[in-house]
Amino acid sequence: MNKKPIILVTNDDGIVAPGIRALVHSMNLLGDVYVVAPNKPQSGVGHAITMNTILYCDSVKIDNGNQKEWECSGTPVDCVKLAISDILPRKPDICVSGINHGSNSSINIMYSGTVSAVIEASIEGIPSVGFSLLDFDWNADFEPSKKYVCQIVKKILYNPIPEKIITLNVNIPKLKREQIKGIKICRQADSKWKESFDKRYNPKGKTYYWLVGDFLNLDDEKVDTDEWALKNGYISIVPIQFDLTNYTILNLLKSWNFFVLFVFFLDT
């Protein structure tokens, strides 16, 4: 790469969150940084976009550095769409999202605004990485993450794969730097949330609910999964894509004779 890369930074915890500030500082070492991020927390919004509602985007300066910054009233995906179409001087060389406060491993990826932002970038043909730290604390320590964040982003910037867009989901264990054992390339663990709703009543007797639940890892001892890597002190990297086609079932379905099925139901 001959020119200085343009790096788009976003997140779902909001533009003032410590995680994105740590990411911005790291990315300033690697290129020209443009931050377009939500003006308030947007955790768990997934791939939602703003429709039938006005979208605001204002230039701001959150802290020191050479980065240019905008805060957006919409979702993380809104931020990426708006940045690419209306804010950046050209298509970014990479989009990075995070560093999220909390895990986006395994099934959590389906709900994540952090990961949805990089999926949106990949739809536009932009290499992208979502970073998450397994620490929900607002004052989480992001220092141990910075070395690995820079290393991963540099690898993508300077080692492109022809005809392929790299999109990665990276999760970092809550450990001191010297305790992190390294990086594991993994698959997404089979998991789910066993959820319930805590039913309550407000002072006027109106019913309301709090979502609660327990995380269930269905691949508990599978060493090739992101959950195993994180549990055992490794950073997990899972390559992801927006194509949700189930190719295993695809060929089976092609063998079905739908005309015969149609005739059968007409005759019954």
In which residue ranges do the predicted regions lie?
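Electrostatically charged, flexible surface regions
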Residues: 143-261
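Glycine-rich phosphate/pyrophosphate-binding loops
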Residues: 122-144
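A cross-family phosphate/adenosyl-ligand binding-site feature
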Residues: 2-3, 7-10, 18-86, 90-91
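Hydrophobic/aromatic beta-strand patches that form the interior of the parallel beta-sheet core
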Residues: 34-36, 70, 129-131, 168-170, ...
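Short, Asp-centered acidic motifs that coordinate Mg2+ and/or phosphate
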Residues: 94
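Alpha-helix C-terminal capping segments
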Residues: 83-89, 116-127
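Glycine/threonine-rich flexible loop motifs
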Residues: 103-112
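Short hydrophobic targeting helices and cationic amphipathic motifs
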Residues: 265-266
